[in-house]
Amino acid sequence: LVDHVYNTVKENFDVAAWVTVSESYRIGDLLKKIAAQFGIAVDVTNNEMRGLAKSIHNYLQGKKYIMVLDDVWAERLWPEIRNVFSTSNCTSRVVMTSRKQTVLATREFAYRIHLEPLQAHHSWVLFCKGAFWTTDEKKCPLDLQELAWKFIAKCQGLPIATACIGRLLSCKPQNSVEWEDVYRCLDSQFAKDVIPDAHLILKVS
């Protein structure tokens, strides 16, 4: 959803940037990514965070910008980087996405949108669209339906996880032996992470 909105509205801003933060990050590396996305020339060998932050702040001064910080896990992130973003233009926007409500609990965010997980039948349609896009009927065979629902249950209604697993299975032979093998691999990966993550799914592929 955020990706769709971002690509739709970014032309209305002077500059736009999208950076995926993820669970483990370092401020210096994150600032370099932000600078690169905005097209700011910085010395990549320079790890002096104050200098990087000032360069970004000065560049954004007076500009109408949109900045998306995707997949934020740490509550400390916004306090660490809030001063990077110029507030001289009230039409600029900073958007953060997170799977943790506590990350976005600060009153500094004017709007919060909570996305509900997909309903079961919507998950099924999305899964089949990915898993069987190469077939003529684009439907799940009866002998794989029980396993298909097990995969869908693992995704907990998350669209990106459902779509990724569907696409992964589309590259595998469509038989229960192959699918069960993939399921076991995913099960061991998900056991290390309470919430399904696209990066974990890609590891299995």
Where are the regions that the model predicts?
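Tryptophan-centered motif/residue detector
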Residues: 18, 73, 78, 124, ...
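A conserved switch/coupling segment of P-loop NTPase cores
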Residues: 4-12, 50-118
